[in-house]
Regions:
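Alpha/beta-hydrolase fold catalytic core
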Residues: 2-54, 74-78, 117-118, 275-278, ...
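Catalytic histidine-centered segment of alpha/beta-hydrolase-like enzymes
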Residues: 285-294, 298
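Flexible "cap/lid" loop of the alpha/beta hydrolase fold
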Residues: 146-185
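Conserved alpha/beta-hydrolase catalytic His-Asp/Glu region
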Residues: 157-163, 181-241
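Conserved hydrolase catalytic core segment
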Residues: 118-160
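Conserved HGGG/HGGXW glycine-rich cap/lid loop of the alpha/beta-hydrolase fold
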Residues: 40, 45-94
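Conserved loop-alpha-helix segment in the C-terminal half of the alpha/beta-hydrolase fold
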Residues: 246-285
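Active-site loop/oxyanion-hole signature of alpha/beta-hydrolase fold enzymes
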Residues: 27, 47, 81-123, 127
Length: 306
């Protein structure tokens, strides 16, 4: 596995002790949010008025990951902030049994239909990007356009040896071991050193890493374990041609790994089957683009949202 795929693998697989989150740039002020709506698998808050933009964070990450973009985005948009139950240390709800990703999609669709948000712009980071693709596949009318931030239609390609076409069946046994190891950490204290180990390489700024460590320690490892397992065995590559909503793939690069020359071809290969896809790259950034380059990320996000 080369250093580029290793970095992405860490972003998805690192939680073998407790798990990395993806975290956003924190603004000094925040838009006023509505009261929280709790559902079986997610909770939702809203801010602002205008055309709807749904923000879905990644594995073991609270909605606060988007704090740095919400104030500006809410000036012209109705911002819907999703949080997976248990990822912020809250009640896990129905997320302690299999089918979490499908449950998230079901809850999102129900919220969109009830609140007349069909055709919304949807943004998902890491695991949230996978959920966005699942939503577009299952409920195409829900999504007007989709932004995928440093995510893949099949995360397990990162574990494939050169020349091997990996399948969910091949990955499932190892994914199950990872799930069980993570779940077994529930209720056990995690040291700062362990947290640092799990967040290493996912952002470039020291203050970002500090926030990531705090969030990693707060997430319910039982939920993290199940969602990680489902991430690894979910393969949407063959579904890409049927996703008609325009897709924007936003990915990072830096002077180490991945370089711009490495990242571009890799992502284009993963999304080659999508009929309507554009690519946006942000340099001097790692997996948590919104932390490393908050201004560039906000600019790309507002351009996407319209």
């Amino acid at each position: 596995m080369n250093h580029f795929t290793l970095r992405l693998a860490v972003a998805v697989l690192a939680p073998l002790a407790i798990l990395q989150p993806n975290i956003g740039h924190c603004a000094p002020t925040a838009a006023t949010s509505t009261g929280e709506v709790r559902m079986d698998h997610i909770s939702v808050t809203e801010a602002g008025k205008g055309s709807p933009v749904i923000l879905i964070p990644g594995l073991a990450t609270p909605r606060a990951v988007w704090d740095g973009v919400v104030p500006e985005l809410a000036k012209n948009h109705r911002v819907i902030l999703v949080q997976v139950n248990g990822f912020a240390g809250d009640d896990p709800g129905a997320n302690l049994k299999p089918g979490v990703l499908d449950g998230i999609v079901t809850d999102l669709d129900a919220y969109i239909v009830k609140n007349k948000l069909t055709g919304a712009a949807v943004v998902g980071h890491s695991m949230g990007g996978l959920v966005g693709m699942m939503l577009a596949k299952a409920h195409p009318g829900d999504i007007g356009k989709l932004m995928i931030v440093d995510s893949l239609p099949f995360f397990a390609v990162l574990r494939a040896p050169p020349g091997v076409e990996v399948t969910p069946a091949m990955v499932a046994p190892q994914a199950a071991v990872a799930r069980d190891k993570i779940a077994a950490t529930y209720g056990k204290p995690m040291s700062d050193a362990d947290a640092a180990s799990q967040t290493k390489g996912l952002a470039l700024k020291p203050d970002s890493i500090t926030k990531m460590k705090a969030w990693a320690m707060k997430a319910d490892s039982r939920v993290t374990a199940e969602v990680l397992y489902e991430d690894l065995i979910t393969d949407l590559r063959s579904d890409l041609p049927s996703i008609k909503a325009p897709i924007t793939v936003l990915y990072p690069w830096n002077s180490g790994y991945p370089t711009r020359e490495m990242a571009g071809p890799f992502y284009r290969k993963q999304y080659a089957a999508a009929p309507n896809v554009t690519y946006v790259d942000i340099g001097d950034a790692a997996h948590f683009v919104m932390l490393d380059q908050p201004d560039a990320f906000l600019k790309a996000l507002t351009a996407f949202a319209g």
